[in-house]
A protein has these predicted regions:
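Cysteine-centric segments in proteins
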Residues: 1-91
Length: 91
């Protein structure tokens, strides 16, 4: 993924700005899905597409891209449940 910011239009008329970059030899993104502050997510290998999340046993967001379409989910570490937040996101 090329460094820079991309804005994705998602279902329900919502948008998400995703800033792609590199830090400490890792592919990262910065997002602000809640409007309360930026979150940095790190790239993790997956079978198909790209996935970014935060290595944590707690709660965190996951940004997954496959075939040009993104999904932002929220992983509740306490309950072990992952819930889609933004779906069908396209640049």
């Amino acid at each position: 993924m090329t460094a820079g910011t991309m804005t994705y239009a998602c279902d329900g008329g919502r948008t998400l700005a995703v800033t792609y970059g590199r830090e400490n030899d890792e592919d990262i993104i910065t997002i602000n899905p809640t409007g309360r502050g930026d979150e940095m997510l790190i790239s993790f290998p997956v079978a198909e597409g790209l996935q970014y999340s935060w290595p944590s046993d707690g709660s965190y967001h996951v940004w997954a891209l496959k075939g040009g379409t993104g999904t932002l989910s929220y992983r509740d570490g306490e309950r072990g449940i992952t819930t889609p937040v933004l779906t069908n996101c396209r640049a």
